[in-house]
Amino acid sequence: MMDNDDALLNNGGPQSGAETVYGTEDNNMVMSEKNEQVVSIVQQLAGSIYQEFERMINRYDEDVVKNLMPLLVNVLECLDASYRINQEQDVEVELLREDNEQLVTQYEREKSARKQSEQKLLEAEDLAEQENKELATRLESVESIVRMLELKHKNSLEHASRLEEREADLKKEYNKLHERYTELFKNHVDYMERTKMLMGSTHSQMSTASERMDVSRARLNPVARSSGPVSYGFASLENSVMLDTETICSVGSQSDDSGPPSLQNELDNLSGTLERGAATDALQQQHHATSPQSPDSSPVVPNVPTNVGRSTTKKEQRSDNNLYQELSFQDNEESEENEIVTGSWVHPGEYASSANDNYFGMGKEVENLIMENNELLATKNALNIVKDDLIVKVDELTGEVEIVREELNAMQQSRTKLRQRISELEDELKKAKEQVKQQNTEQEENDVPLAQRKRFTRVEMAMVLMERNQYKERLMELQEAVRLTEILRASRTVDNLDRKSKQSIWKYFSNLFTPSNRPTERVADGLGGGPMFRHTGGGSPAHSHGSPSRGSGGGDNRLALTSGQPPVHPASAGLANALIMPKDYAEEGSSERISARRREQYRQLRAHVQKEDGRLHAYGWSLPINKASQEANPNRHSGGVPVPVYCNPLAEASPHMKVFCAAGVNLHGGFTKNGQSLIPANSPYAPKSTLKIAEITSPTADQSMEALDRQMARVSLETLEPETQLSSFVWICTSTHAASTVSVVDANQSATVLDAFPICASHLLCIASVQGAMESDYALLEQSEVVKAGEMLQRPGEGTELLGKVEFVRVKPKSDDEQNSNEKQQQEEEEAKEATEKSNEQLPAVSAEEPLGNVEAIKIRQPLPGAPQRLSTDGNQTNNNNNSSSSSNLLFATKSLNPILETKDRDEPAMSSVGPTMWLGAQDGWLYVHSSVGRWHECLHRVLLPDAVLAIVHVEARVVVALANAQLAVFRRQTDGQWDLNSYHLVTLGDRNHSIRCLCVAGERIWAAHRNKIFIVDPVSLNIVHSLDAHPRKESQVRQMAATGAGVWVSIRLDSTLRLYNTHTFEHKQDVDIEPYVSKMLGTGKLGFSFVRITALMVSCNRLWIGTSNGVIISVPLAEVQPKSSSDPHGQMPLCCMANAQLSFHGHRDAVKFFVSVPMLQQPNLNGGLTFTNKRPDMLVMCGGEGYIDFRINDNDMENSIQLEPNQTIENRGDKSYLIVWHVSQR
């Protein structure tokens, strides 16, 4: 037994990552299989003891067991308490195990995140180091350039200083030469005076002297001219002239011994000084010298030929006249002038002998010195130029050496970086190899169920984060809060559990002492593996319905699909016998990698679906074979299997149009106060009424037999399900980025859009159908306390949230300007609509022969009058006797015929809100009221509410609207039957920062969901009757509610569990988790099906229709439990079992948006009205969502089946909103 318990715990325990849901009443909830087996053990013991006591009482007497009874009860209570303690400990162990797994996964996640952050930090540090190194290299290059510029600047300063020193030396030389010149001039003057004196005494020698003077003058002519080659500074002279000059100088120097110190010594000293100065400035390099460098050289005369010969190595350039040449030329002119001025006679011989010898000797010496000085200066200049060139060359070479050194350092740094990069790449290669190994091991674990795995793989976590990133943020918080809440609840309710167990045991054994009420049935053992369903009915025992597992059951329990159904018609019966389903399957991505991965996932999904043993696939549904639970419930009406009859996009022309909500049209009512109906009598939907309203509302009116008959008919009509009272018309709200549109379709002909018109620029969040004014509505209006009290019906709230506050709001009447602006706005809207209609009419019609894509024909059981037919542009039906290939072509058209009033082109009479209406709520707070009979596009009333409108319901001649600020707006009719939108009541249900997500009508009361609470409100008195917590955590909001019979099914945000509550006692009856079922049917989460969230919920055809966030559609047949009193028709409890659940292989790519159920056909009676009977009509269940998917498609057939239209992409095909319609027979 313990082994079986452990196995059951392992198979049915909470999975890692899934949310655990806890109820409020342990007697009416199913926690796990082990809990039920523990209770069944106690029940078995109690049943066996009960039988023994019964035999003892029958054989002996009641006194035998009176003393033994308390002891046995105490023993059973202790045993029950021990079992419950064991259950709580098992729950705590499971919670601790889940916490441990979550902590491990969180630790691994944090560890990987830390590794990633460290890796990013290292990369940032590497980038910073690289930038710093680059900046450092730039700084070093700038510093080297600065050093080079400083060196050049220093060299230029040194060169400037040397030039200044040279200039100073030249000035000194000039001063010395000037002083020497003055001395020479004085000596010359003295010599001339002496010569004059000598010429006066030696007159006899005049003739000879004159001749010698002519010869000397002839020789001196080249020298005396200031324009000669020497006087003008040329370095090369004529040889003849140089020889003559040397001869003269030699003669002069030998003849004169008594003069002043020789000029040659001073010039030699000066040349030596200049040579030493030049030697200090010149570099130590060999160069052709133009003059001797040794101070001990021979006299000037022997050096002259050498200088002349060497002068050919340099350019011959003209220099300025030196000071001596100019002065010597002036002296000759002055001597001639003196000779002319003085009239004294001078002997020519004396003049020639003295003047010529001295003059020519001194001039030659001075000339040689000057030439040597010029040559030395030219050599010095040449050496300085060479020195400067060498300095510049050295600077260039130094800069190049620095640049090469920097390049070498940069190459070394790049080499070290490349080595580091190579090491990093090697490490990454090692990590990649390890990851490949891990992925190989993870792929081997893909077929292992989640319950048997130790943790989630990285691939699964990545898929979950990608598909449900908006829910993953709060998953850990919700699980932690659930765990804490469960611990607190378990600690608080231990005493309550003991008390309840004692009461149940005493109540169980109390029947022993009442022989008249002694049961005749044995207690059924609860050994089934499924959940138990119990009802609290008197002293009857609890019945346990087993849930057969997959693959159990023999051939006798096989489901009969065709029992009670018409025979299958052949395919040649026409287009009405075929289901046209274009395979508009959209791609999720355009890249090859994503496509290959998706094909692999679909292949695994298809393989998983095909290996499901023990289930039957029929009409696109996965059906259980075992019918043990159905045989145990004879009151159950499953109604066969839903058959798909239609699947296509809602609007082919608008691929980006998204569906939001839809509602079936209720055409009942519509009577004025005088008993006149707004629907014409010739219409097949015209109601039948022969009694005036005044006769009913009048207190003196007699109750005739017709009124009683009509009342009985109304009662019989109310006993039917609400969806059976609807017509087959459906209003579907769609929205784009620009505006929201309503499309009116007939569910019998879903391919035909009867009308489509815009409503507003905001999104339409909800829609509801409200029947017209009935006779009872006028009686309620006159007798209502709300109408009598008016604004007096107000009530203050309780607490800080003002819970239950009722306030009356009256809308101010509009001024004339506002009315004119509204009329002008309506006129512009009508013009825009007409322009849109004209543009649509001008579009080319699609030919009937043009295919719209690959289609798939599925045979159905009977021809449907509402099957999609081929339509022409004028709305008439074309010939159906075409080839079988033409049946794949489908044309979507919009009928201009109103089937209710039988009018064309919107040529209907004026409508009012007395008749049936459609109420639409927008996101911007506007509430719109349109007629559902005629002139659908015209808005009858509209009002701006304080916040967004989220839900609308109609009950007890009132319309209740749920707002996003936690308030309910209640509207009522006026005395003339029209709806009053100028005044309404607001009921506050909680914190205004949170919204009322959904509304539900259960009986005559409203169930409003605010966060995790459900408030039951009386729509007449506006009082809060009761409130209950659907979930222990406030952040877990109630999202959907569906009422039927005596129960209300509730779904929670971020939760895959449905909860059932009793509408009368508000008790929690059952919990149903759909996540294990979806995981079992569609795999272990490859496509994200393991994280199931409920987005659409509806009860219809005795089935619970469930739509999930990933497009999966589930239909669960309900097992109704009969109430205690048969007089209450609404007392059936709609329990269900997931073992009988049916999963549709036709689904959506995104969340399921809505379910709508309408009657399939309503045949008009002979009197012109609709005939309503107690028989259950066949129903059409419509589902809407984004995209279409078939979970059975093989590999890449889904991508290959897509045929794109012109100017259309695969992404646009996936954006379309699809409608899927099933036919459900209830006969």
Swiss-Prot record:
Its main location: cytoplasm. Residues 84-191, 363-489, 814-849 form a coiled coil. Residues 1-22, 281-323, 517-572, 804-851, 863-889 are annotated as: Disordered. The keyword Thylakoid does not apply. Residues 526-540 have a biased composition (Gly residues). Residues 453-524 form the RH2 domain. It is found in: Cytoplasm. Belongs to the JIP scaffold family. Forms homo- and heterooligomeric complexes. Binds the TPR motif-containing C-terminal of kinesin light chain, Klc. Pre-assembled syd scaffolding complexes are then transported as a cargo of kinesin, to the required subcellular location. This is JNK-interacting protein 3. The lineage of its organism: Eukaryota, Metazoa, Ecdysozoa, Arthropoda, Hexapoda. The gene is syd.
